[in-house]
Structure formats: structure tokens, C-alpha cells
Amino acid sequence: MRSLVVFFALAVLTGCQARSLFQADAPQPRWEEMVDRFWQYVSELNTQTDGMVQNIKGSQLSRELDTLITDTMAELSSYSENLQTQMTPYASDAAGQLSKDLQLLAGKLQTDMTDAKERSTQYLQELKTMMEQNADDVKNRVGTYTRKLKKRLNKDTEEIRNTVATYMSEMQSRASQNADAVKDRFQPYMSQAQDGATQKLGAISELMKAQAQEVSEQLEVQAGALKEKLEETAENLRTSLEGRVDELTSLLAPYSQKIREQLQEVMDKIKEATAALPTQA
């Protein structure tokens, strides 16, 4: 019965763990934070003053954006591997397909971010070389592009998020179905085991009652034997004492007779003395 309980508990726990993998209030994944940082970095290029723009090096901008792209892809890869690891026990086929889909979407996101890096480097160079009147035109184009970039990055992020949600929902459904199937399959065995345990407890209870009755009877027999032994001991003691009293009486009898004789002599002497007294006239 213990093994059935453990197996059934594991099945229920599996369903609970699967549901916990997809929660609406889950914190934002690290890779999404990196995408937001990338876009903010690009959009801030259009807000820099002319003097600050002149101090920014194109190579420096390219390296920093490359770093953000690399970090984003690394976080997204780690996120994908973590999801695949968690999904494999419940749906290995879906986990493998999710990994492939995320690779395609990650490639699309990387392409858009790389394009944004190249465009930003190009715009920076134009801002440095254009005259003041043309600089405004470049800034307008930068502003337009950053708005479009925001939409593209949001779309890429949303596609990844929706893809993950779809697979998580499927996995949750499978896990729930498996848990219900296991429950239905093992419920008769659980009931049978429970009935067996109840019968065993009943048998044990009857055995304990029988043993208790046997012990009670043994105690009654022992108590009766002890009573008889005590009565026998008391009778022996009484007989012994009676014998001692008779013996003591026999020993004291001569002395009693002698005392009576002496008392009688004393009484006779008193009578004689009384008779000898003169009679008053």
C-alpha cells in the first residue's frame, strides 16, 4: 500500500509542478530585460546634444551594441534550455520542437538587433558629418527608425512569449491529463488497499481482545490460587497459635492452683481473726 501511495502522490505532484512552470505573474525573463536595454540605448542616440554626439565614437557604439546583442542571445539560449529541461519529463517531443522554434525566433530577433546596430552606427556617422540644418533631418530619421525598431522588437519578443505560452499550455494540459489518468487507474487499487488495511486492523483488534481475555482469565486463576494459599497460611497460623495457647495454659496451671490455695489460706486467716474480736455490749 505504501508504494501505491507514493506513486499516486508523485503523479499528483507532477501535475502541480507542470502548472507552476507557467504562471501569469511570473517575473520578466532576463532576455526581455536585455532587449529593453538595447532599444533604450538606441533610442537615446536621438536625444543626445550635438556636443555629446561628437564625443561618441562609432566603434565604441558598435562594441556596446554588440555586447548587448551577445548578452541577449546568451540569456535567451539559457532561457530556452531551462524550459526544455523542465518540459522534457512531461512532453519530450514538445520540448524538442519548442527548442527548434525558439532558435528560429531568436535568429530573427538577432537579425533585427544587428540591423539596428548598423543603422545606429550609420546615423551616428551622419550626425557627425552633416551640417546643423541637415542634422535635424538625420535626427528625424533616427526618431522614425527607433519607433519602427521598437515595434519590431516588441513583435519579436511577443512572438517568443506567445510561442512559449502555447507550449507551456500544451504541457500543462498533458500533465493534468496524465495525473487524472494515473488517479483513475490507481484509485481501485487504493480503495482495495484501504479495505485490506481496514480488515487487517479489525483482525488485529480481535486478536488483542482475545489476548486481553486470556490474560484476564490467567490473572483470575492466579488470584484464586493466591487466595487459597493465603487462607491456608492463615489456618496454619491459627492452629499453631491455638496449640501454643493450650501449651501455655498447661504450663501455667500448677501456678494457678498454688495461687488459689494461698488465697484461700489468707481468707481463712481473715475469718479467724474476725471471729476472735470481742463482741461489743
Swiss-Prot record:
APOE is an apolipoprotein, a protein associating with lipid particles, that mainly functions in lipoprotein-mediated lipid transport between organs via the plasma and interstitial fluids. APOE is a core component of plasma lipoproteins and is involved in their production, conversion and clearance. Apolipoproteins are amphipathic molecules that interact both with lipids of the lipoprotein particle core and the aqueous environment of the plasma. Homotetramer. Residues 1-18 form the signal peptide. One of its GO terms (cellular component) is high-density lipoprotein particle. It comes from the Eukaryota. This is Apolipoprotein Eb. It comes from Danio rerio. Residues 67-281 are annotated as: 9 X 22 AA approximate tandem repeats.
